[in-house]
Amino acid sequence: MRSAWGYSRGMHPHLLDVFSRLDRSRAALGAAVESIAPALREQRPAPNQWSVAEVLEHLSMVERIFTGRIADAIATARAAGLAEETGDRSPLADAIETRMADRVNRRNAPEVARPTGTLDAAAAWAAVEGGHQRLRALVSDADGLALSGVMLDHPFFGAMTVYQFIELIAAHEGRHTEQITEIGRTLAGSV
């Protein structure tokens, strides 16, 4: 049987929790994009700021990188005999949540996650959606396994579990949802 989110009710509660958060962030992102006229989605609000299409491309790039790292960590853990999930899930640390929500202090994306500007908004959205599908398929395939013990290193935030990495993806998406909302306000004021 499937839940309202389309997930199996037999899915481990830890995975349901993080997937539900990811779905909520995705819905908010979609609403923010839809609130901006399609003709404005490739327009930069200022020369040194990203367009909506570029923000979406960035999100797809980051998710692709994170999904690859999660895939490697799960594969390594499985090869070492990853057991069934019995542990508690530690949520993403409050300090990381706070940092991700901070839109006052600008951050510079690493080179590998900087948008090329070659995708229009529709193609960038499709890339984001495709990335989410790959992430969900990958992690769903490990449903019930001890993902709370599978650790990955983040270059800035340090060691995190698979669940925390998924929450980080949602928090990162939330940060950029706010950015898209800001872009929309700026562009609406310049029309």
What are these regions (language model features)?
Residues P13-Q49:
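An N-terminal domain-cap segment
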Residues E42-R99, E129, Q133-V191:
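Short, contiguous alpha-helical
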Residues A121, W125-G130:
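Hydrophobic-ligand binding "helix-grip"
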Residues T98-P110:
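A structural motif
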Residues P110-A122, P155-Y163:
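Acidic/His metal-coordination segments adjacent to aromatic residues that form catalytic metal sites
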